[in-house]
Amino acid sequence: VVCLFTSLGYSADRMDDQRAVDAATVALKPGALFVLDVLNGAIVRKDLVEENCQMEGEVRFTLQRRVEGDTIIKDIHVDDQGCSHRFIERVHAWTAEEVQAMIARAGLLLEELTDGPDTAPFDPVTSDRIVAWARKPR
């Protein structure tokens, strides 16, 4: 079972994320692998681009980002030839310790933390992502 591209962390209730990992654990056969991929909150905080604009044809996208507590907030403004839309995305700024604790609470055995699918070792100061490789006990 895989949860890639920060598929967790969008609910205001952290227990929703735990329930998702618990459900994945139930679905796994003994000895099977679970992979969880989330943004490294420390890097997001450090390298946050507060605002940028981009054009896609005639459509202008303005993205504003900020961190409030342990949440990364992205405010997306879309202007399509005078018709405006606004979307707000909120995602949890994960730490490796939070990911490890969630894996352990689900009863999985953490094998490794990496900085993405290339399996470079996770470094809390430089890794863009936290990828947990965990196995369901036999």
Give the location of each predicted region.
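A short, flexible beta-alpha/helix-coil linker loop
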Residues: S7-G9, G82-C83, D118
